[in-house]
Amino acid sequence: AFFHLAWAHTIGAGRNDMPAQIENIRYTIDAVRTAAAMGCRVFVGTGSQAEYGRVDGVLRADTPTNPENGYGMAKLCAGQMSRTEAAALGMDHVWARILSVYGPHDGPNTMISATIQKLLAGQCPDLTAGEQKWDYLYSADAADALYRMACHGRSGAVYPVGSGTARPLREYIETLRDAIDLALPLGLGKIPYGPQQVMFLQADITKLAADTGFAPRTAFADGIRATIAWAKTQKQTN
């Protein structure tokens, strides 16, 4: 199996850098051809919830796609083109539309990572009101989902990947804070929602579970403690 997770220009203005996003599509096709040349039988590509745009309901494989930025547009195109290329090369293809993943080794610019760093420094993080309903999946569980997709996924399938449950974002943030120090303040409501703020994000993992046997195993409280522990080791070495 070949797992393609690489992607450039994933944050900020880079998400609408159209020439750069087109290069990401090209790299995905290159990855398919490389996988075939290596003798791989299945190509597992990682897409994004950004392929859907803003949706009020639970995300399924057949939920209409209406991406609102170049990143989401390119992910959608890469999934479609790589599926066609894989078929032409006689290779199975599975596409994961990943929602929000957290865990050790996460990038510093995610909301989870930035909030952890602020709280570990004893500072009050500036946040939105946290009313968004969100679906978070621990990184080890996400890796398990991709592995199961390679082993048991249906060729040509698209699988939304998440925990399958949604909670208000402020609840996740409060759980995170409580794992560090109950007394630390949170700046909930200090940042306004952006013009394209997604207010509901939840994956329907019914098909993923049926086809592959996947089930999330890590509660957020446990996963965030492991993430904080890792962040503390990074703070000590820097």
Q: Where do the protein language model's features map onto the residues?
A:
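Active-site helix of classical SDR
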Residues: 70, 74-77
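NAD(P)-dependent short-chain dehydrogenase/reductase
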Residues: 57, 80-135, 139-148, 173-179
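Conserved catalytic-core motifs of eukaryotic protein kinase domains, centered on the activation segment
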Residues: 12-19, 54-59, 107-108, 130
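A short helix-coil junction within the Rossmann-fold of NAD(P)-dependent oxidoreductases
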Residues: 9-13, 34-42, 152-153
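NAD(P)H-binding glycine-rich loop region in Rossmannoid oxidoreductase-like domains
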Residues: 1-23
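Structural signature of the Rossmann-like NAD(P)-dependent dehydrogenase/reductase core
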Residues: 4, 42-45, 53, 94-100, ...
